[in-house]
């Protein structure tokens, strides 16, 4: 009787633990369902928008246990695009992103907390050779089956970073000290 009870208990624990594992997703950049955008004020008159065209990443998602979720993203900083070739060249220089020395930026989450219907994703952003904690406010846009037999989940996130925190000290004026991040990703569940 004790062996049967022990076996049942172990089997139950294994089954329960296995079903609580967060699903892993790969960001769908091939289908153009993911964007890492930013905006910064230009002389207090308007917004300058830009994007990073080359990035990759994964995330795990467990709606019932968000604290177990993880996010990992790598961005090719040379892929910055603001729709102006000369400005993009300047952004790639040592005055800003210094892509020759730091060709990648990375974000690795350290915690995920559910706040109402949003997720606060805190992690380490490494940019221009500096690593600082950053919190993104994310919202689940939807999840479910796709037409090709797979599963997908989509999120939008926003956050802000201060340029000086990442050793970008070029004087752009008082209105241009922070960059707003606007991120939209759709992930394909991995099997």
Swiss-Prot record:
Its main location: periplasm. It is found in: Periplasm. Keywords: Periplasm, Signal. The keyword Signal applies. It holds the Pfam family YceI. InterPro entries: Lipid/polyisoprenoid-bd_YceI (IPR007372), TTHA0802/YceI-like_sf (IPR036761), UPF0312/YceI (IPR023480). GO terms for cellular component: periplasmic space. Residues 1-22 form the signal peptide. Belongs to the UPF0312 family. Type 1 subfamily. This is Protein YceI. It comes from Salmonella newport (strain SL254).
């Amino acid at each position: 009787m004790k062996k049967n009870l022990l076996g049942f208990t172990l089997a139950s624990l294994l089954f329960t633990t296995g079903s609580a594992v967060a699903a892993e997703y790969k960001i769908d950049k091939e289908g153009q369902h993911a964007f890492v955008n930013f905006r910064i004020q230009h002389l207090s008159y308007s917004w300058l928008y830009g994007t990073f065209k080359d990035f990759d990443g994964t995330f795990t998602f467990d709606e019932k246990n968000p604290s177990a979720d993880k996010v990992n993203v790598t961005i090719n900083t040379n892929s910055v695009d603001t729709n102006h070739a000369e400005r993009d060249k300047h952004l790639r220089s040592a005055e800003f992103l210094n892509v020759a020395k730091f060709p990648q930026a990375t974000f690795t989450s350290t915690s995920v907390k559910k706040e109402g219907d949003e997720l606060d994703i805190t992690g380490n952003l490494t940019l221009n050779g500096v690593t600082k904690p950053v919190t993104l406010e994310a919202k689940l846009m939807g999840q479910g089956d796709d037409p090709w037999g797979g599963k997908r989940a989509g999120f939008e996130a926003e956050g802000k970073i201060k340029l000086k925190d990442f050793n970008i000290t070029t004087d752009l004026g008082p209105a241009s000290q922070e960059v707003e991040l606007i991120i939209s990703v759709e992930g394909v569940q991995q099997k």
